[in-house]
Structures are given as structure tokens and as C-alpha cells.
């Protein structure tokens, strides 16, 4: 995952590497705990259908790097590289209104809370030899 990759770069003492303009590249990041709750609620919907699961709040890749550095107690800056992809999608945001109405789904884990809860696993995975 992006969070693990950036976390491992930081734990290696390196500035996290992101595309130039990463403060403007937005994604609708969601915590797995919220995804599980949405799936449980989808077992008994008010109406059958296809449901979007997300937070409806897009956040930047830069925000992930900044939160990780704050949680890991570092200030390594950010290493920016040119984005090599033409037509790179700059913004995703889930419309969860139908999920809210028909499933009673509401995301509860913020990006900050999710990353904070993940720090011990990032450190554990970083120290694990998988070769």
C-alpha cells in the first residue's frame, strides 16, 4: 500500500517520494474498518443495488506523507519526482449518498486515525526480513 511504502521510506531515513503536485492529487482514502462495516451493512440493505464505499472526503498523497512524518516523529521533507503518466487521474471522490440512505453507512475512521493505528504494523513490517 502507499502508506506502507511511504512509511518504509521514512523509517529508512529517506524523504518520502511523491509526484510533483501531490498536494493537488486527491483520492478518497478509506480505512479497512469502514469497508468492513459497509459490507456488513450491505447484507441487509433497504434496497438491493450497487453501493459506493468511501469517505466522500478526498485527501492528497501529500497529506499521507505529512501524517506519517508527524506520527513517526520525523521532518525529512518530501522528494518530488516528475509524474511519468499522461492522463493521470488527479481527483477521485466517492458519492456515498446511496450507501448512507440505503445501508445506513457512515465512515468513522479519519485518515489521521487510520494511519496512527497502522504505525505499529508499518514498523513491524519494516523490521521483518522477507527475503
Q: What are these language model-derived features?
A:
Residues 1-36, 40-43, 66-71:
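NAD(P)-dependent short-chain dehydrogenase/reductase
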Residues 15-18, 42-53, 76, 126-131:
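Core catalytic loop region at the nicotinamide-binding pocket of NAD(P)H-dependent oxidoreductases
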Residues 111-131:
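Amphipathic terminal alpha-helices
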Residues 28, 57, 92:
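Residues that recognize and position ribonucleotide moieties
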Residues 12, 41, 70, 105, ...:
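Residues within well-ordered alpha-helical secondary structure of globular protein domains
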Residues 20-22, 50-51, 60-66, 73-91, ...:
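C-terminal "lid/loop" region of Rossmann-like NAD(P)-dependent oxidoreductases
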Residues 32, 62, 84-106, 110-113, ...:
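Conserved C-terminal active-site "lid" loop/helix of NAD(P)H-dependent oxidoreductases
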Amino acid at each position: 500500500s502507499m502508506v506502507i511504502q511511504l512509511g518504509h521510506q521514512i523509517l529508512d531515513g529517506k524523504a518520502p517520494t511523491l509526484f510533483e503536485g501531490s498536494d493537488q492529487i486527491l483520492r478518497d482514502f478509506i480505512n479497512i474498518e469502514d469497508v468492513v462495516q459497509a459490507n456488513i451493512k450491505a447484507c441487509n440493505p433497504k434496497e438491493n443495488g450497487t453501493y459506493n464505499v468511501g469517505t466522500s472526503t478526498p485527501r492528497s498523497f501529500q497529506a499521507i506523507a505529512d501524517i506519517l512524518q508527524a506520527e513517526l516523529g520525523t521532518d525529512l521533507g518530501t522528494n518530488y519526482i516528475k509524474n511519468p503518466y499522461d492522463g493521470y487521474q488527479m481527483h477521485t471522490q466517492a458519492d456515498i449518498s446511496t450507501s448512507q440512505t440505503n445501508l445506513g453507512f457512515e465512515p468513522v475512521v479519519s485518515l489521521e486515525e487510520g494511519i496512527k493505528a497502522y504505525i505499529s504494523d508499518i514498523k513491524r513490517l519494516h523490521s521483518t526480513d522477507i527475503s
